[in-house]
Amino acid sequence: MSVLINEKLHSRRLKWRWPLSRQVTLSIGTLAVLLTVWWTVAALQLISPLFLPPPQQVLAKLLTIAGPQGFMDATLWQHLAASLTRIVLALLAAVVIGIPVGIAMGLSPTVRGILDPVIELYRPVPPLAYLPLMVIWFGIGETSKILLIYLAIFAPVAMSALAGVKSAQQVRIRAAQSLGASRAQVLWFVILPGALPEILTGLRIGLGVGWSTLVAAELIAATRGLGFMVQSAGEFLATDVVLAVIAVIAIIAFLLELGLRALQRRLTPWHGEVQ
């Protein structure tokens, strides 16, 4: 009887597994350690609370600015909506223009010869270097910020589309042509599916660059947005607001990355696991 009980207990132990992967567990543990160190340093006042407020103060301030009181004549959600609107408009423009441009460059040596030097000339330059020029040409309104973010996203998207077209397997293209497929059918059913993983990877890279460019642009030329909140709070030495908004910026960037990874897994399941 005791042997049967021991076997059942042993089988239950074998069946139970830690629900999270090793990587996720390590990530959560790292964040927990960082928060513990932060809380300890703040509790012992090793650094002045003016420069490093405790986590609970930052959380309380985050809840405050998310409420009706807000910050700088707008709530956190209004600032967040302004930032997300800019990044979404710039991303849509980069997708609508960048992907066709990249595909055209991959299919036509003439188009590539015309556009490749232009993209390669401006691509290495940090996007913020163009900000003064954008402000001079378009003022400090929405156009300058959206155009700056668009420039940051466009190059990775276009070049990834170009790389995706170049990586299309010639065997599949010839097989489709031998079966009587037209050029449009080859493009739509062979080249585009083969290029899609590269295009989505370029979108992930471009969105990351665009998000950082957005926040930096709002630090300089904006009256609403997450970057504007950080800049304004820094001028008043409101460190708790600065840290709260930085946390929001990091969380939004993380969620955008997770969303694009999920989209990539769904649209390109044959490409293997997205890292």
Per-range role (PLM):
Residues 1-32, 258-275:
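Transmembrane alpha-helical segments of polytopic membrane transport and secretion proteins
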Residues 160-205, 226:
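Short cytoplasmic-facing helical segments at TM-TM junctions of multi-pass membrane proteins
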